[in-house]
Design a protein with these regions (language model features):
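Short alpha-helical segments enriched in small residues
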Residues: 1-86
């Protein structure tokens, strides 16, 4: 895995721990890579809550509430869909 990605993930985890926060992620094209990268860090059960991989457009709509209209107009790989996934 890319060293820069691992470094950024470790930095995020330090901030989560310092703030006493937990994280939930929603992914699509990355296919779970973000969740995998984060949970590879020791102690993940202390700050990692859950993850969704909604690769299919139907899953984005059903699970995350992404607007079908936005998917049709902008496409799955768009800033608008990413914002709705968040």
């Amino acid at each position: 895995m890319d060293v820069e990605i691992q470094t950024d993930a470790a930095r995020l985890v330090r901030r989560l721990r310092q703030a006493g926060l937990r994280i939930t992620v929603a992914e699509s094209c990355t296919g779970g890579l973000l969740a995998s990268t984060l949970t590879d860090i020791a102690g993940a059960s202390d700050w990692f809550d859950q993850s969704w991989v909604t690769y299919a457009n139907d899953a984005k709509t059903r699970v995350l509430g992404v607007s079908p209209d936005t998917l049709d107009r902008k496409g799955a790989v768009s800033a608008e869909v990413a914002i709705q996934m968040a």
